[in-house]
Design a protein with these regions (language model features):
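Flexible, glycine/small-residue-enriched loop-and-beta-strand segment within the central core
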Residues: 1-89, 118, 126-127
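Intrinsic disorder/low-complexity detector
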Residues: 46-49, 97, 140
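Hydrophobic transmembrane signal anchors and adjacent membrane-proximal interface regions, especially
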Residues: 76-81, 99, 133, 143-145
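S-adenosyl-L-methionine-dependent methyltransferase catalytic module, highlighting the catalytic core
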Residues: 126, 136-145
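C-terminal/domain-terminus segments
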Residues: 83-123, 128-134
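A generic alpha-helix propensity feature with a strong bias for hydrophobic helices
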Residues: 58-64, 113, 122, 131, ...
């Protein structure tokens, strides 16, 4: 039987809607003033491994596969997660980000970014000089955030 030493930290003034699921075997750190929509999943692990030579055998039922973490999840301060967002193992979301409804975050979202889609892609960044959310050039081919 595997042993885990999970570390879960939720900052002050977090606002969570209904059906928010936070699962942790390694580490989940959530900053202050999170606004979290309905049906959000934040997890630092998966049932099995799906890359490389140690990938899980599909003949083994998912519930019997070992829990595997690709790394802790870190969510900064003043972040808004829209309804249905999934934040997966190893994801880092910087301060002041907005993650659009049903986005899947698998990598790093820089501070002050609006990201949408699956996988999450940056579409706007906050400009302190202009005090506005500016489109990212070539947003139609928005960079994949990894």
């Amino acid at each position: 039987m595997a042993r885990f030493s999970p570390s879960l930290r939720i900052g002050s003034s977090a606002r969570l809607s209904d059906n928010v699921h936070i699962a942790c075997i390694k580490g989940v750190s959530i900053g202050n003033h999170l606004l979290c929509g309905s049906g959000v999943l934040i997890t630092d692990h998966a049932h099995g491994s799906y890359r490389g030579v140690s990938a899980s055998d599909p003949a083994v039922p998912p519930a019997q596969r070992p829990l595997v973490s690709a790394g802790p999840v870190v969510i900064g301060n003043n972040v808004w997660l829209g309804d249905g967002v999934a934040v997966l193992a190893g994801a880092v979301i910087g301060d002041g980000c907005v993650i659009g409804a049903h986005a899947v975050v698998t990598g790093t979202i820089p501070p002050g970014t609006i990201a949408v889609g699956s996988p999450a892609r940056a579409i706007r960044r906050w400009s302190p000089e202009e005090r506005a959310w500016l489109p990212i050039p070539d947003a139609n081919a928005a960079e994949r955030l990894s």
